[in-house]
Amino acid sequence: MAYTLGVVVGILVTIAAMILIACAIFKLGNKDGRVKTEYDERQKIVIGEGYKFAFWTLAALLVVLQIAVEVESDFGDTSIIQSSLGPLTFALIIVSILVFCVYSIWHGAYWGINNNKRDYIIILAVIGIVNLILGAVAIMRSGLVIDGALSGAFVNLMCGVLMVVVLGAAWIKDMIDKNRDDEEGDE
């Protein structure tokens, strides 16, 4: 498939713009105005463990996906799984990211020491809502499955669900910590 120079330039400009927007968001979300989030030593250890669990989750899910592809091929039906490998693989990546995020939240390592937690919650909520809206609009226009394959709307929905679950896990963890602090304060 040959691309024209205009398409290539458009893709590169879009990537550059997204990088700049991401840097601006990180700067806004950190108390010190830096792009990089800082973590203490305990948080770094927890983050490493979270990455390990996320990696093994992804590896196991990819094995399951490969088995499903083989089983589907053996039955001569190459419909939804093989024609949707891109969105399904992306979904597995989202699940592994979710494992990392929830593990980090649960062990107090998700928010860096220089993060403005409230700003990050707002950013995550906006990203989640935008993705859910984009996914819902695309599904209303074209459907979730097009010509036997999952549509791009599936990816938006997965990103939106990721943000909702991360925010839900953060809220639950905050409630547990608040109750624990209240109980310790009463003693």
Identify the function of each model-found stretch.
Residues A17-V35, I93-A109, I172-K173:
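Membrane-water interface of transmembrane alpha-helices
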Residues V69-Y103, S151-L167:
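Hydrophobic alpha-helical transmembrane segments and immediately flanking/interface helices
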Residues I139-V155:
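Extracellular/periplasmic helix-loop-helix junctions in multi-pass membrane proteins
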Residues D177-E187:
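Short, charged juxtamembrane terminal tails flanking transmembrane helices
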